[in-house]
């Protein structure tokens, strides 16, 4: 995770696995899966195309360290946009962009309006 407080809480709740939680933009080594939960929703710029490129670049940097795949969730609408500092992707466009990494499955996240979970596997 990139948030020190989240890592501290994970280590507190799971002390037997504390060494498995780290702060950083990339996993510290090879992992089975990388999970990005809400990581890319808050956006501090006002250029949705640039933010989407940032997301794909971040995933591209992480992909070589993933043995099996990556999972992420994004808010999705009919148009790629940023509204009130929240990024919204177009599900079909994001699915197509993620195919450069591998097989992509996308599904609405139950109980969360506009939220879509993407699973990318090798």
Protein language model regions, located:
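A short SAM/SAH-binding and catalytic strip from SAM-dependent methyltransferases
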Residues: 33-52
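Class I SAM-dependent methyltransferase SAM/SAH-binding core
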Residues: 1-27
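Short "lid" loop at the C-terminus of a central beta-strand within the Rossmann-like core
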Residues: 40-42, 75-80
């Amino acid at each position: 995770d990139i948030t020190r407080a989240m890592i501290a809480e994970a280590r507190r709740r799971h002390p037997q696995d504390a060494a498995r939680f780290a702060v950083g933009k990339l996993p510290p080594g090879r992992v089975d899966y990388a999970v990005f939960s809400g990581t890319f929703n808050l956006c501090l710029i006002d250029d949705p195309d640039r933010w989407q490129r940032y997301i794909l670049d971040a995933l591209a940097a992480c992909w070589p360290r993933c043995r099996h795949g990556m999972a992420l969730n994004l808010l999705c609408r009919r148009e790629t946009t940023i509204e009130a500092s929240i990024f919204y992707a177009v599900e079909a466009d994001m699915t197509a962009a993620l195919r450069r990494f591998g097989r992509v499955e996308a599904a609405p996240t139950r109980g969360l309006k506009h939220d879509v979970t993407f699973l990318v596997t090798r």
